[in-house]
């Protein structure tokens, strides 16, 4: 009975997602500037427009991360660091000292122009592009992939660029 209550209380609402990463990734090609096209809402980027993420590869496969955006015309930025894991396409990212979060590149086009990123949680999803606007066919393909993976794409916030 206790087990059943635990499942009802904690397990039934868990969204099943496929957050598997790309099979290979060249971090030198992934590095650089990315526009955040869409994202799930989360506290640390709430109401931000013109969002970008810049990744700079350092020694020992460490990556410096700079996230920028604007809120009510005011420039906001957050610097962090990332480190690679044994799983291709998966990073550990920190913006707050020793506390790391999961970051997964789940879809990446062959030319490293567009990406679908997430984490181990169904609460994080983002669409990145090297350009501020996605081609409609590319957008629909990424949305279809996210939906196939179990994400509710109706929750995406489309970022003003």
Regions found by a protein language model. Name each.
Residues 1-9:
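Bacterial N-terminal signal peptides
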Residues 12-161:
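A beta-rich soluble binding module of mature secreted/lumenal proteins
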